[in-house]
């Protein structure tokens, strides 16, 4: 009985403590590189109240790699 009470208490504590955590979500759209970094940050803040960065991505495809810029917007759900 004592062990099951301790286990129940731990489960309840875990559920309560994990329910208050903010989850991180993301959104993304194309941007034109570092010159649009400020626009990426402004749009991310306006749409989601988050932090946006314009990042270069490369897909190593044959015969030539594909590169593109994406605005990665990270925000609390």
UniProtKB/Swiss-Prot annotation:
The molecule here is called Putative defensin-like protein 185
Q: Which family does it belong to?
A: Belongs to the DEFL family.
What organism does the UniProt record list as the source? Arabidopsis thaliana
Decide whether keyword Signal is in the record. yes
Which cystines does this chain contain? 25-77, 31-54, 40-71, 44-73
Its chief place of residence is: secreted
- Signal peptide range equals 1-22
Which keywords does this chain's UniProt record carry?
A: Antimicrobial, Disulfide bond, Fungicide, Plant defense, Secreted, Signal
Is Transport there in the keyword field?
no
Write down the superkingdom of origin: Eukaryota
Any single GO BP term: defense response to fungus
GO cellular component: a single term: extracellular region
Its localization reads: Secreted
């Amino acid at each position: 009985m004592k062990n099951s009470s301790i286990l129940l208490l731990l489960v309840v504590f875990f559920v309560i403590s994990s329910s208050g955590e903010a989850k991180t979500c993301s959104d993304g759209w194309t941007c034109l590189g570092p010159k649009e970094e400020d626009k990426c940050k402004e749009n991310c803040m306006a749409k989601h109240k988050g932090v946006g960065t314009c990042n270069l991505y490369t897909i190593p495809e044959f015969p030539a790699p594909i590169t593109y810029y994406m605005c990665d917007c990270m925000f609390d759900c």
